Amino acid sequence: METMGRHVISELWGCDFDKLNDMDFIEKTFVNAALKSGAEVREVAFHKFAPQGVSGVVIISESHLTIHSFPEHGYASIDVYTCGDLDPNVAADYIADALHADTRENIEIPRGMGPVQIKQAQAKVL
């Protein structure tokens, strides 16, 4: 059975505090990441928390990109889910680079193939 989608869960550590706390920067980064991967952006929604942190989603024709940032820990939780021929790692890597992550761990899960099959996690210290 062919996969219906690819879901990358990305754990980003050692990120820049100011970038993780800047909603406009994160929104632009996520839209650019989607476009760089070849996706078609449909909707964008982000929220800035007090005293810090940003959560948001970019809905793409091919699925979505999400973030929950924790600037006080230098940490961001990222999800990139794509359908079709798009590679979610393109967007995930773009985001990690933009946030200046020191360490990233990506787990890719093929979606729509029956029982969940988690591919080997890939961790990079940058």
From Swiss-Prot:
| Annotated site residues (Cleavage (non-hydrolytic)) in this chain | E62, S63
What are the annotated GO cellular component locations? cytosol
**Names of required cofactors:** pyruvate
The entry's function note states: Catalyzes the decarboxylation of S-adenosylmethionine to S-adenosylmethioninamine (dcAdoMet), the propylamine donor required for the synthesis of the polyamines spermine and spermidine from the diamine putrescine.
InterPro entries found in the cross-reference section: AdoMetDC_C, AdoMetDC_fam_prok, AdoMetDC_N, S-AdoMet_deCO2ase_core, S-AdoMet_deCOase_pro-enz
Belongs to which family? Answer: Belongs to the prokaryotic AdoMetDC family. Type 1 subfamily.
Q: Name one GO biological process term.
A: spermidine biosynthetic process
Q: Where is the active site?
A: S63 (schiff-base intermediate with substrate), H68 (proton acceptor), C83 (proton donor)
Q: Which GO terms describe its molecular function?
A: adenosylmethionine decarboxylase activity
Listed as disulfide-bonded, the cysteine pairs are: none
Q: In which pathway does it act?
A: Amine and polyamine biosynthesis; S-adenosylmethioninamine biosynthesis; S-adenosylmethioninamine from S-adenosyl-L-methionine: step 1/1
Positions bearing Pyruvic acid (Ser): S63
Catalytic activity entry: S-adenosyl-L-methionine + H(+) = S-adenosyl 3-(methylsulfanyl)propylamine + CO2
| Designated name of the protein | S-adenosylmethionine decarboxylase proenzyme
Keywords noted in UniProt: Autocatalytic cleavage, Decarboxylase, Lyase, Polyamine biosynthesis, Pyruvate, S-adenosyl-L-methionine, Schiff base, Spermidine biosynthesis, Zymogen
Textual note on the cofactor:
Binds 1 pyruvoyl group covalently per subunit.
**UniProt modification remark:** Is synthesized initially as an inactive proenzyme. Formation of the active enzyme involves a self-maturation process in which the active site pyruvoyl group is generated from an internal serine residue via an autocatalytic post-translational modification. Two non-identical subunits are generated from the proenzyme in this reaction, and the pyruvate is formed at the N-terminus of the alpha chain, which is derived from the carboxyl end of the proenzyme.
Which Pfam families does this chain map to?
AdoMet_dc
Carries keyword Lyase?
yes
The UniProt entry, under HAMAP family, shows: AdoMetDC_1
- Record the organism: Bacillus velezensis (strain DSM 23117 / BGSC 10A6 / LMG 26770 / FZB42) (Bacillus amyloliquefaciens subsp. plantarum)
> What is the organism lineage in this UniProt record?
Bacteria, Bacillati, Bacillota, Bacilli, Bacillales
Where are the annotated coiled coils located?
Answer: none
**Keyword S-adenosyl-L-methionine attached:** yes
Q: What is the protein's quaternary organization?
A: Heterotetramer of two alpha and two beta chains arranged as a dimer of alpha/beta heterodimers.
Q: What is its EC number?
A: 4.1.1.50
